[in-house]
Amino acid sequence: YRSIRNAYAGTSLDSDFYRPVVYDDTTVYADVYKVKPREFSAYLQDKFEKDEIVINFGLRYDQFDANTTFPSQRRNPTNSSTYYLQKIDGTDSLDINGNLIIDEERMSSPKNSNISEQYSPRLGFAYQLGRVAVLHFSYGHFLQMPPMSAIFENKSSIIGPTDYSSVVGNANLNSDSLGLNAQKTVSYEVGLWQEINPNTSFEVNLYYRDIYDLLSLAVVSTYNQIEYGIYTNKDYGNVRGLELKLDYNLDNIFIQTNYTYQFTRGNADNPSQTFSRQGSSIDKVIRFIPMSWDQRHTFNVSLGYNTSKYGITSTGYYNSGTPYTFSPQGESNLALLNLYPNNDYKPSNYTIDLTGYLNLPKVFGFQPNLNLLIRNVTDRRNEYGVSSETGRSYTAVVDDTELLSHRSDFNSYEDRYQDPSMFSSPREIKVGLTIKF
């Protein structure tokens, strides 16, 4: 990207004159690079079956090559300062010609990124209990490379003049020294499927996942005492939960239900959390907090009646609220500093969708079909975004001073906090015609 800036910014003419200027990649106002990373993966799987036992074994191989370079000295990434060797007494060291000797350890040079290689074993086990029940267990490693932006962002390593104002990507892959590695999830699951009668089945699953090497930002201090952030892996999270399923089928009628009870915890909710808190002189989080996708209850149910000529299906979704950071107005600054992220939950929400089809008689060999889709049948206004002060949408804590100080020719003060995107989409109806020939 390139930012369009005012050429008079930071001068006495800033408020009266404007001349657009586009800076190049040697400044903090642009980030331009061209890279060609390479990625390869392969998966092997084998199955063993004997009597009531089935065992699946798999192994996945992933290779990623950023195909780029990175600075060898993170404390002086662009060689903005030159450093020379000094003697113990503090005087400069000279070579045989009387010239100053550059301190190579404090200077940076381009270094090729390593190729990241990962092996992920997977194991599945199933045991049939009689004719109408199956006990199953699974274990597996799942690896995911960080997003490309975490590798290539600010590739020129331009560090701004103020602390905590700059972030750089990290192409030092597969390294234990301020490196960037794949995020690793180790998953365990055990479950039981039981046929209650020929038309009904029930399944229960217990699962637990460890998430290692979550993306984070480490703080690096340059030799000029400017602190900036660099992507690395140092955060951890885990997920544990219970899943219940009930399926019913009778002729043209079907019912499918799914309920999940889940906890998600970690020491940081997003990669920049620790970096931002440190930049704001806020203590780091020293306990597990709910992650942004933590959702205690999830319940889905589908009801349908389908024939060869017509059919209709209704699906309902219920979700308990996800976390947000409650920051009440009027609290002391010390109390606000000590508030942990994601300390409260948004309101729960539900949605009902409806789909249907009708196969019309053929016309000149063509088969027309009518399709119906209704999203959010009840036109429910689910609150997906909330105010950090009230915990609800379209609300805020406003005093008279704030109202009197508002000056605008374009909007009212209420427009500041009444954001329509906080709510779910309204009812949507689609009718379609499909012609098969």
Spans of model-derived segments:
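Residue-level signature of outer-membrane beta-barrel architecture
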Residues: 46-50, 61, 117, 125-128, ...
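Gram-negative outer-membrane beta-barrel transporters
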Residues: 206-215, 222, 226-328
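Signature of Gram-negative outer-membrane beta-barrel scaffolds
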Residues: 1-130, 146, 150, 164-166, ...
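Transmembrane beta-barrel strands of outer-membrane/channel proteins
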Residues: 1, 57-63, 137-141, 150, ...
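Residues that define the transmembrane beta-barrel architecture of outer-membrane proteins
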Residues: 36-40, 115-119, 184-186, 238-240, ...
